[in-house]
Amino acid sequence: MRRAFSRRSALALLVTGFGGLCLDAAGAGAAPVTLLNVSYDPTRELYEALNKAFTARWLAQSGQQVEIRQSHGGSGKQARAIIDGLQADVATLGLAYDVSALYKQGKLIPENWVTRLPYNSAPYTSTIVFLVRRGNPKNIRDWGDLIRPGVAVITPNPKSSGGARWNYLAAWAWALRQPGGNDATAKAFVEKLYRNVPVLDSGARGATITFVDRGIGDVLLAWENEALLAKKQLGPDKLDIVMPSLSILAEPPVTVVDKVVERRGTRQIAEAYLKFLYTKEGQQIIAQNFYRPRDPEIAAQYAGQFPAVKLVTIDDTFGGWDRAQATHFDDGGSFDQIYGQ
């Protein structure tokens, strides 16, 4: 209870302080400013909606016009682009390992970046689900069905895609929890799964296009938000969503890129932008775009949209992202051993 109270209190304090920060940041007639949000693959629609709301609020409260530009791609590739010089004011990536790389490899953010915003700097969560053709013709119900002969599985490349790493680890976690499960049996299971993968796209949106637009595959391993968006856009008569018996808690984090905002003089606006994600308005937009909101009241309002599912965490099952990355996704790790270099 104490932990839940402290998180709610931190969220309330952050939301309360948002308006004051905006009013102090700029005066009427301040020069227009542009921010660059470098994000992972399937967040286009989410941030288009958030950007529209934030810039309107900022203009009303400060008198300053803001344009927020977006860059999207596989989370790992986006992190590498920032390290290599892409001038991101904020990074909103698919997993903590990719954000931490901005500190470890680029020294662009401080080591304690994860503590600067509530919920480990992750203003929303998601999980991994199965997207299948209408009527589920291959009768895919759980992870074990993905290794059956004749089942074509679509998932992106975990070398470049954050969502693909969540997919991979969710499958591994399920296999670990089967009778007699251990790392050896989990590796054997995931190897069989990847034998059923006909193509590896570089990011989650590319994999969705392969499955939905190109008609390849029987099941797409997808972010829950991406699956719900695809079903909405195509209509309920085209696709079904299957919730597996176990999945993984995905917590995509956000951060200001300190070295960039200090050089460009955009820190106040960039920080206000990320804090906006935690406001009631921001959390409503997050839920409307099929991400699971952190705000308890908003989460309760959208409970029917997000069914309950048993979730494992990266820390409890894999010892955190550093260990998971080294074991599974670095050169020579389990993915390379399974799929070939």
Where is each model-derived feature located?
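N-terminal secretory signal peptides and thylakoid transit peptides that target proteins
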Residues: 1-17, 24
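N-terminal segment of the mature folded domain
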Residues: 31-160, 339
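Short beta-strand->loop
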Residues: 38-40, 113-122, 132-134, 144, 152-179, 194-197, 231-248, ...
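A bilobed periplasmic-binding-protein/Venus flytrap-type ligand-binding module shared by bacterial periplasmic
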Residues: 127-136, 251-268, 285-289
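Ligand-binding pocket segment of bilobal, Venus flytrap-like solute-binding proteins
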Residues: 178-245
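Extracellular/periplasmic juxtamembrane helices and adjacent flexible linkers that interface
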Residues: 261-341
